[in-house]
Amino acid sequence: MAFLCPVRMRRDKKKATNASIERDLPAVGVLGMGRITGSSSIETLVRVGIEKEHGLSPDSKMVVLHDFTPCVDDELEVKRGQLVNILYRENDWVYVIGQDSRQEGFIPFSYCAPCNTQLADLAVKKKLPREQCPEQPIEENIPLLGTDNKLDVLCDETLNPGSANSIENTLLVEPECTPFVKEPSGRCIVLYTFIARDENDLSVERGEFVTVLNREDPDWFWIMRSDGQEGFVPASFIYPADSVRVLQQQKATLNAMETILQQGQQGQQSQQQQQPQLGLGTDDLRYHGTELVMLYDYKAQAPDDLYLSVRRGDWIYADLTNQTVDGWLWAYAPKTRKYGFIPKAYARPPAMTSL
C-alpha cells in the first residue's frame, strides 16, 4: 500500500465580517490561541503578525526531511534539506516561513525536524546514507480526496475513532536511519581523476592519496583529502595504498636482480673480448685465479650463459678469494674460453708430487 501524506482539513475560508471578527477575537491585550483555519484567515494573519513582531525564536528553526508538494492553496512547497521557521502548529500541521524564499504556508509536522539533530543532518546531506534513507515516493504527495470531500471524511473520523488512531499511527511512522559513522579505515591512492557533480561529491586527481572514512555504500566511499576536505568519490576510482607499496617493492626487487644479472653478463662479455683468439700462456691464465682440475663431468642445467659445461680432467681457473655464491665457483674454462658457475665440490687444485 502506497504511503500517502496526511490531509489537513480546512474550514471554509469565507471573508469574515467586522461582526464576526469582533466575535472571534478576545478582548484587547489577551490574544487567543484559536484554531488555525487557513493562511488567509483572520486568526492566521493576526498570529503571523505577532510572531514576526516578537521575532523568530531559535527553537523555531527546522529542517525539512522530505519533499512536499502542496495539495491546496494555503500549503507551501518545500524540498528536503530546506531551512524553515515554524510560526505555530495546528495538530499534525505547522505554519512555516522559508528562510531563503520567505514564502509562507502549511506543511506536515512530521516532515520537519529541529536543527542539529540526527534526522536534520541526514536531510541536509542528501546522500547520507544513500541506501538507508530512501527518498519518499512521489505518490505520497497526492491528496487522498478533493477539497469538497474533506468535510465528509472529518465526520467519518468522528464516528470511527479507532480508524482515526490507526491512520494517525501510520502517518507518524518515519523511515529508520542509522548514524553515518566516519572513522579512518585506510589510505588509498586515486586511480582516475574525478570531478564533483553533486553537492556532497569531492573532486580528486589521479595519483593523490586520500583517507577513507566510510564504506557503507559499496559504490561510493566518503573520503578525506590531505587538505581536510571530505566528500563522496566512486569506490572504483581508488585503490588501497598498502597494496600499491607492496607491488612497488616487488617491482624494485625484480629490477635490482635484473640489473645485477645484466652487469654480470656485461662483465663476462668484456672479459671474453679481451682474451686472445688463440691459446693463452700459463702466466696469463693465472691472472684468472687459482688453477683447478675437474674431478667429474658437469653439464649446464640452464640454457643461459651463467653455467659452464666441463668434463673430467679439464683445467679451469677460479679466484677462490672472491666467490659470492655458496657451493658454487665462478670459473674460467680455457678450453671453451667461457666463464660460468660450476659446483664447488667438482674441482680441486692438482696434486703436486715430488720427483
From Swiss-Prot:
Encoding gene per record: Dlish
Description of post-translational modifications: Palmitoylated by app.
A cellular component annotation (GO) from this entry: cytoplasm
Protein name: SH3 domain-containing protein Dlish
Principal localisation: cytoplasm
SUPFAM superfamilies xrefs: SH3-domain (SSF50044)
GO molecular function: cadherin binding
Subcellular compartments: Cytoplasm; Cytoplasm, Cell cortex
Ranges of residues in domain SH3: 57-117, 183-243, 287-352
Gene3D superfamilies: SH3 Domains
Species this protein is from: Drosophila melanogaster
